[in-house]
Amino acid sequence: MILPKGREDLEGFSIKSFLIDKKVLILQIVLTLFLYNKFGFCVNFIIWTILLYILILLSIIDYKFKAVPDYLLLLLLLISPFVSDSLIDFIKNGFIFAGGFVILNFFVTFYIQNIKSKILKDDTLKEQTALGEGDIPLIAFIGGILGIKLGLFAIMIASLIALIHGIYNASKKIQDTPFIPYLSIGFIIVFLIQETIYNTFSNWILS
């Protein structure tokens, strides 16, 4: 299941240790080159580079610690409006998107804690939630930047990848599945291919 974020798990956390990791550096270089090819050297390039670096950090931290620092989520939300076409649309779509998932989280969490826990006779499920505290701000970011419909594409991709990985984890008897890495992957994929999505589903997206 998707985990709540535990602050105590972040003890000893250091951003520097992640930045010097070779795989992280390679991923950062690849995304930076893509952004440079897309925007050239401009303000948008700089802001998007920062945003994607934050997403990478959040993903790695969540995957390792099952928790994320609040200041990175706050930084993401404060910077992202600068690359949005409209601040008002960013705020509106972000609130609508996040609000919808907060309600969904309530129902799914109720099912996990009150129904599934009794069916499986597993008391540990009574403490689990469908989404962690750190997932909602990232969902708001996705909705604000991509809009409602493209945001749904990103969530669908994230959920599909999470489902596949969750099945693998279940086969290995690993229950904990952090969701932020999948949300980040879904967002980046849609961001990279959004023109293709527009061309394929333009009638639905623009309606």
Task: Show where each model-derived region lies.
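A membrane-topology feature that recognizes alpha-helical transmembrane segments
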Residues: 1-207
